[in-house]
Amino acid sequence: HRWNQKTVFYEEASKVPFIMSYNNGKQLKSEVFVQSGIDVLPTICDFAGIPIPATSKGKSLASAFTQINQVPNRDYIVVSDQLSQGAPVNGQQLNPEGRMLRNKQFKYWIYNYGTQTEVLYDIVNDPGEMVNLINDPNYTTALKNCRAQLFSWATEYKDPFIKYLVN
């Protein structure tokens, strides 16, 4: 996509493998499932046998690696992005921030700044994320569902970005 940074929501930058090594004398397994960075701390705490902080928003994934048929089932994940810029551009300090929701078929993202703040991709039929469907009337229901899921997530996790979301 010719972006000069890795803080974007395209698959090449946001679909990062989560690799964990844990040696407790048991044979662990390899699993493919969707997880979020907010799950790392609770997972490490769980493996270490220490309490998960009450302020942690994630969920432990330890059982996915140690028990049979315990892979977490999520309808979607949310990824956040905050671009930090050093020098002002035309006298204005820009620090765009965004959220991305990815479910089984669609990827929706929204930024608080820019000329195209919302994007919707059908990642099943357009895995290269080349056609923005945000204004396509055939995808109105998908867009509403993605917006509602992201709003629900932001409400649950008390995300201050909620003020930019469309519901």
Which residues does each PLM region occupy?
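Active-site rim elements
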Residues: 5, 25-35, 47-53, 87-88, ...
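Histidine-centered active-site microenvironments of extracellular/periplasmic hydrolases
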Residues: 1-29, 35-36
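Intrinsically disordered, low-complexity polar regions and short flexible loop motifs
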Residues: 126
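C-terminal cap/loop subdomain of S1 sulfatases and analogous C-terminal strand-loop tails that border
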Residues: 26, 39-41, 46-119, 153, ...
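Generic structural marker for isolated residues within well-ordered, non-membrane alpha-helices
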Residues: 41, 130, 150
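Conserved beta-strand positions that form and line the central face of beta-propeller blades
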Residues: 9, 18, 30, 60-63, ...
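Long, internal low-complexity/basic segments
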Residues: 15, 133-167
